[in-house]
Design a protein with these regions (language model features):
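Conserved acetyl-CoA-binding loop-helix of GNAT-fold acetyltransferases
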Residues: 89, 95-108, 131, 135
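Active-site rim helix/loop that mediates acceptor-substrate recognition in acyltransferases
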Residues: 30-52, 56
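Conserved GNAT acetyl-CoA-binding A-motif
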Residues: 103, 110-122
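Conserved active-site alpha-helix within GNAT-family acetyltransferase domains
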Residues: 100, 112, 124-142
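A conserved beta-turn-beta hairpin within the catalytic core of GNAT-like acetyltransferases
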Residues: 71-84, 94, 141-142
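A short beta-loop-alpha structural element at the N-terminal edge
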Residues: 7-19
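Helix-loop element at the rim of GNAT/NAT acetyltransferase active sites that forms part
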Residues: 20-34
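Conserved beta-strand in the GNAT
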Residues: 53, 60-69, 83, 88
């Protein structure tokens, strides 16, 4: 396997098309318009939201991470908790330390914002994500099943 050089850095204006491409790979149930609306919201509310990217140096991004500051997070002890909203590395670039580097970068951002805790979530059946979190020092705090009922 050849060595892959990458740089972890904050999102830049020139990254929007690549960020959208990666978001569509991670959250493929959302439309491009939905993604664009969310991206605008993140950019316009950059005090409490943050995007880091894994830059391959040739105009391509291999991964990204979106983080935020949440005023309350289940099972956390403090207010204003850093939160990993979503992170993704393209399959061909996994197992190279890119995901961990993205998370470390986001944790540094949260510390700079005054946070003393970082939290995240993973789908109950997404064992790969749960294992990735665990390798980075995150521990499971609880499991939750969402329920709904139509009121007619």
């Amino acid at each position: 396997m050849t060595e892959t050089n990458f740089t972890i850095r904050p999102l830049a204006e020139g990254d929007l098309a690549e960020w959208l491409r990666l978001r569509l790979l991670l959250w493929d149930e959302s439309t491009e318009d939905d993604h664009m609306a969310e991206m605008v919201d993140i950019i316009e509310n950059s005090d409490a939201q943050f995007v880091a990217v894994a830059d391959l140096g040739d105009g391509r991004l291999a991964g990204f991470l979106e983080a935020s500051i949440r005023s309350h997070v289940e099972d956390c002890d403090t207010e204003n908790v850093g939160y990993l909203e979503g992170w993704f590395v393209e399959e061909s670039y996994r197992q190279l330390g890119m995901g961990g580097s993205l998370v470390n970068f986001a944790e540094d951002w949260a510390r700079q914002k005054g946070c003393t805790e970082m939290a995240s979530d993973a789908e109950v059946d997404n064992v790969v994500s749960q294992q990735a979190h665990s390798r980075l020092g995150y521990s499971e705090t609880s499991r939750l099943v969402h329920l709904k009922k139509e009121l007619v």
